[in-house]
Amino acid sequence: MMVKLLLLFLVCWSALPLESSPLGNRYNLEIGEKQYYISLAKTNWFEASNHCRQNGGFLLNLESREELELLSPHLHPAYSYWLSINDLGERGVYVSEATGLEAPFLNWSAGEPDNSSGYDRCVELWLSTTSFQMNDLPCYSSVAFICQLN
């Protein structure tokens, strides 16, 4: 009986894709040449960016629709995720914090960016109807995040 319980425990434990990190659980992922980890811990944009940098990466810098489509099936629909994009330097000019250059790919939800709070300066990826799209949000909001490691 004890052996069966031990085997059951090992099977269940090995099926879990999440690893522990200071900000909660994360899911490691490799797509092509790129490595990501998806953290389900909710935090503000600044803490998320710092966490990625401390782990040798940066917040996700989406470069194309193709990259978004490859990544989307791995994202939980109940979560939204910080990206590296913000307009903290100049309102309306969306720059990737990862590169310091204008964001190479923007896929806004209908009506976005709208700066609805008056402080929407950072960009999240969220499920808008049937696909993940971008939304501007106050940087101190707490959402999950995606780090890119290379």
UniProtKB/Swiss-Prot annotation:
| Residues with attached carbohydrate | N107, N115
Q: List locations, semicolon-separated.
A: Secreted
- Superkingdom of origin organism: Eukaryota
Protein purpose = Galactose-specific lectin that displays calcium-dependent activity. Binds to the surface of hemocytes and enhances hemocyte encapsulation and melanization. This is likely by interacting with carbohydrates on the surface of the hemocytes. Also displays agglutination activity against the Gram-negative bacterium E.coli.
Keywords annotated in UniProt: Calcium, Disulfide bond, Glycoprotein, Hemagglutinin, Lectin, Metal-binding, Secreted, Signal
SUPFAM superfamilies from the entry?
A: C-type lectin-like
Signal sequence region: 1-20
Q: Which gene encodes it?
A: lectin-37Db
Query: Which cellular component terms (GO) are annotated to the entry?
Result: external side of plasma membrane; extracellular region
Protein name as annotated? C-type lectin 37Db
Please give the positions of the paired cysteines in each disulfide bond.
C52-C147, C122-C139
According to its UniProt entry, the protein's GO biological process terms are: calcium-dependent cell-cell adhesion via plasma membrane cell adhesion molecules; encapsulation of foreign target; immune response; melanization defense response
